[in-house]
Amino acid sequence: MILDSLRAVLSSLPFWVAVAGTALLTPVAGRVGRRIGAVDSPGQGKIHTRPIPRSGGLALAGGLLVAVLGGMAAGSGAISWSREMIGVLTGAGIVTCVGLWDDMKGTTPLVKAIGQLAAAGCLVLVGIRPDFLPAPLAVIIVPVYVLGSSNAMNLIDGLDGLATGVAAIAALGFVAVGMAAGVPIVSGLALVLLGSCLGFLLHNFHPARIFLGDSGSNLIGFLLAVLMIGVVTDRHDPRWFVAPLVILGLPIVDTAWSIVRRRRQRQSILAGDLGHIYNRMVERGLGHRGAVLACYAIGVACVACGLLIVGSIGRGPS
């Protein structure tokens, strides 16, 4: 399964366009970020010692859009112009814009949640939802996926290259899952997301020259939610639900542990702290790069476990 996915990646024009497009747009996004004030200044609890632009979402969004449009123009089987794709692109635009505003001016969790709910509404309107569930439940589950995934990726974006690399590893897993499930929009979007993350990682790995920012982490989280929802549409076997959650095991577990930890300490679950899994790794002597690479290894293990679950179902819809 994974070998088929690797062959699909290496032979995919949209993947390579996403890699090149995002890599080339990232320095431009950095300059734009400095000009519009989307800059992360050094401070307590931060590892960088100089102001760094946090406008990476602009580069990711630009690279993704170029790759998707290029795939459509080239007649890529995995990426085509459809109402579902329009819904995905619209939702992606919403979370990117809301996130960028937060990176520039700062905003409240409520405003960010409203943006994420609006993006989830775009998916529901174009039919990206678990159709086999009763309509009210299917409509409720989509925002849960979007809010959960977006905030999980935001929380794990604490070290240079961490969120981007973990997302790339998960995206490769979703390429395989989409192919096994026979859902072209999942495998196609996963290919493009993988390429964009790798292109951005060239500038974001330690020492980072640019950060994802809320625009980038929310965009990645939204697209991962789309992939998870796309896998479970029209599938009754519960293993199709479980496999995507296992693939994203690291950010999900880190988020769950953060909520529990903060409640125990009588803190707001929205309060930042240094108790994340990756922070503990740094404290125990792994260092910045070592902690990131260790998290990558955990991400690979999660993807492997998710693919084992999918393999136990067999190819094609259940």
Model-derived segments and spans:
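Alpha-helical transmembrane segments
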Residues: 2-37, 61-97, 136, 141, ...
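Juxtamembrane helix-capping/reentrant segments at transmembrane boundaries
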Residues: 41-55, 278
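Hydrophobic alpha-helical hairpins/lids featuring a short glycine-rich hinge
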Residues: 86-116
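Mid-bilayer segments of alpha-helical transmembrane spans in multi-pass integral membrane proteins
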Residues: 96-100, 121-129, 151
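Single transmembrane alpha-helix segments in multi-pass membrane proteins
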Residues: 146-154
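PRPP/pyrophosphate-binding module of the type I phosphoribosyltransferase fold
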Residues: 150-151, 160-164
